A protein has these predicted regions:
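A substrate-engagement module of RecA-like helicase motors
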Residues: 8-12, 16-24
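Thiamine diphosphate
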Residues: 21-25, 35-52, 58-239
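Mobile "lid/hinge" segments at catalytic clefts and subdomain interfaces of large enzymes
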Residues: 1-13, 29, 197, 231
Length: 239
């Protein structure tokens, strides 16, 4: 029922119906597209998964295996705070407290406070994120405070930038933020929707440079090379 933060968009309503009906709901978006369908309710059970995959591995037509899992399964602290535990630092498993403590101001919180201040002073300022609202400090309480001036498009960075471009055309001042690695997904929209059309928007890059995330899929070292050659785009890296 969630990916990172709460879900947004029309698809999730039908996915919920399928979960609640154990996959038997008459309204099934996958079958509507011509696929066969199998629902696995106990997706955290390895044996159940093996049984499901054994049933479909030799099938002669496309099938969607819809697997229901519990985020944080097996660790009560994570089960009770799913958004915060989507990603974490090394921690003490008994208490859930991080092994590294930090009590100063973070860039995330500083950025959120600045954007919130601008939003309160100007109702045309709109913050847009793609499923990672806390990358610029928009915790659940901040999201509620921002109201309609905060938009989470889900894991759809392409839509986030295209939406920002449309908002500009209608008099808004969009601020789009996501992690450095995720900007590669929306290169075309940045180039064609924003920059070719000279639509002014602010893009905030999180976890960039060698000081960002260091796993192979989330490296933040490519954004400047990728985007700085796009006409009408100015990349500022003050830190």
């Amino acid at each position: 029922d969630m990916s990172i933060a709460e879900n947004h968009g029309g698809l999730y309503k039908n996915l919920r119906q399928l979960r609640e009906s154990n996959g038997t709901c008459e309204c099934n978006l996958f079958k509507a597209m011509g696929f066969d369908y199998m629902y696995v309710n106990e997706g955290n059970d390895i044996q159940k998964l093996i049984e499901a995959f054994e049933k479909v591995k030799d099938i002669d037509h496309p099938i969607v295996v819809h697997i229901n899992t519990l985020k944080g399964k097996g660790y009560k602290i994570a089960e009770e705070n799913k958004e915060m535990w989507h990603w974490c630092m090394p921690f003490d498993k008994e208490t859930g407290k991080w092994n590294i403590s930090f009590d100063g101001e973070s860039y995330d919180n500083l950025t959120c406070d600045f954007v919130m201040k601008k939003m309160k002073a100007d109702k045309t300022v709109t913050a847009i994120v793609a499923a990672v609202p806390t990358c610029i400090g928009f915790t659940e309480d901040k999201r509620k405070e921002a109201g309609k001036q905060f938009i989470d498009v889900g894991i759809a960075e392409e839509h986030g930038i295209a939406l920002a471009s449309g908002l500009v055309k209608n008099g808004c001042k969009p601020v789009f933020a996501t992690h450095s690695s995720f900007f590669q997904r929306t290169y075309d929209q940045i180039s064609q929707d924003l920059c070719i059309n000279s639509n002014p928007a602010t893009l905030i890059v999180n976890t960039a440079s060698v000081y960002g995330m260091d796993d192979v899929t989330h490296l933040g070292i490519y954004d400047i090379a990728m985007m700085s050659n796009i006409p009408n785009l100015v990349y500022l890296a003050p830190t």
